């Protein structure tokens, strides 16, 4: 799977787990709605660590927790 697909799947999964909307994440993280939408819709070509960190803060998790997923297991990303 490509990296942007893995990021999208994980973000959507976490939003579902937290019963949070993209708008709520925007208000909690400060990451623009368009950036969140781009990630969710796999329209991003690159997401920097600062954005991921801010999203994680909005979700109430660490970067480690974000990447603690089979989507990011060794050999899964073919980007």
What annotation goes with each model-predicted range?
Residues 32, 43, 70-74:
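The DNA-recognition helices of helix-turn-helix-type DNA-binding domains
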Residues 15, 26, 56:
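The alpha-helix within a helix-turn-helix
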Residues 43-54:
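Short, basic-rich loop-to-helix N-cap that marks the start of a DNA-contacting helix
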Residues 12, 23, 53:
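Residues within the helices of the helix-turn-helix
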Residues 13, 38, 67-79:
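Short, charged recognition helix plus adjacent turn
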